[in-house]
């Protein structure tokens, strides 16, 4: 569980925002959503593979854009 230090002069909304950010970084909500329902192992593999393909496509697109920028620069 993420913990934050709240000085006396800080407002509640600032502390809440910092706590939410800490929870997001720790991955608590995503983990909760994953274990909320049982997911079959085949579905889990399929989801992870789709995420990997998406990451790879995004990486390729960034590389292509960088190449295009290099070509147009000269």
UniProtKB/Swiss-Prot annotation:
InterPro entries referenced in this protein's UniProt entry, alphabetically:
Ribosomal_bS21, Ribosomal_bS21_sf
Which GO terms of the cellular component aspect does the record hold? ribonucleoprotein complex; ribosome
Q: Which GO terms describe its biological process?
A: translation
Source gene? Answer: rpsU
UniProt-recorded name of the protein:
Small ribosomal subunit protein bS21
| Gene Ontology molecular functions | structural constituent of ribosome
**Pfam families, per this entry?**
Ribosomal_S21 (PF01165)
Lineage here is: Bacteria, Pseudomonadati, Pseudomonadota, Gammaproteobacteria, Legionellales
Keyword tags: Ribonucleoprotein, Ribosomal protein
Note the superkingdom of the native organism. Bacteria
**What is stated as this protein's family in its record?**
Belongs to the bacterial ribosomal protein bS21 family.
């Amino acid at each position: 569980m993420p913990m934050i230090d709240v000085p006396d002069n800080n407002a509640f909304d600032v502390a809440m925002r910092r706590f939410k950010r800490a929870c997001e970084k720790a991955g608590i909500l995503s983990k909760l959503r994953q274990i909320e329902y049982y997911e079959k192992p085949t579905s889990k593999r399929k989801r992870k593979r789709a995420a990997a393909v998406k990451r790879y496509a995004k990486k390729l697109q960034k590389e292509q854009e960088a190449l295009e920028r290099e070509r147009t620069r000269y």
